[in-house]
Amino acid sequence: MWSGRFRQPLDPEFEKWQRSFPYDQRLLPFELAASRAHANALEHAGVLSSEELSEIVKALGDIGRRAESSPEFLNDPEAEDVHHFVEKQLAALIGATGYKLHTGRSRNEQIATDLRLFVRESIDTLQNLIADWIEAILARAETAGDSASVLPLAMPAYTHLQPAEPVLAAHWLLAYVEMFLRDASRLADCRKRVNLCPLGSGAVAGATLTLNRQAMAAELGFDAPTANSMDATSDRDFAIEFVDALSLLALHLSRWAEEMILFSTCLLYTSRCV
């Protein structure tokens, strides 16, 4: 794709190395959604006719359905990245009309938008899982000590793997509720900064067309458009912030798993090993 300045073909190994589609194909649903929003904005701006918009939207839907039903459809050795893949498939389905979709749009804003949509969906999925996990812990805490419960009413609390003080089993469980509530809070706070729409930012200095950024943001469920095009297309701090929140969540899950292992050993509960 970027070979116009080269005087000889790229080395096959380099060409394979610089392809990101085997990795970023997971962004395809978000690329298609963002492309639909951009197509609607182009039609509103008078760049696309209503017939062309219908063609593009239908073709984007066809691409998504085929990708879901036939995973081998994504095994395209010629696709450089997810943007190139969609552009190539559009051209195959509707010809020159497919290329018009890229009018007034840059790959810089495309990947920034795709990543924000991906991170936002990941946050929402995790929030639901954390809520279910907290609910399960609370249910166990309420029944600790009951005859049907595997948990005793009281248990030793340990410091440095030595019995320190007696505590209610529910107290130990509720400690994890606090940890996971903080994890959920961090993810919710991160989501506020994720949920801004870069579409309309162009490569770096904004779009040359009059595109309705508010409408594109609303269509994709964003709170608002991003405020600065240079920032929107060049910064990925939201992704780092998300990974940081994940690292703390993973730490708490690891702590839980470690304690489950310890509490299952003869070292801590000899009565269960008799």
What is each PLM-predicted segment?
Residues T143, R186-D189, R193, F222-T226, ...:
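Conserved helix-loop functional segments at active or binding sites
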Residues R213-R236:
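Active-site-adjacent "gating/activation" loops or surface patches in catalytic cores
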Residues A239-I261, T265:
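A conserved active-site cap/scaffold subdomain adjacent to cofactor or substrate pockets
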Residues G202, A207, A232-T233, C266:
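Fold-independent oxyanion-binding glycine-rich loops
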Residues L168, M230, D244:
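Conserved short-loop catalytic and cofactor-binding motifs
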Residues Y269-V274:
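Conserved small/polar residues in nucleotide/adenosyl-binding loops
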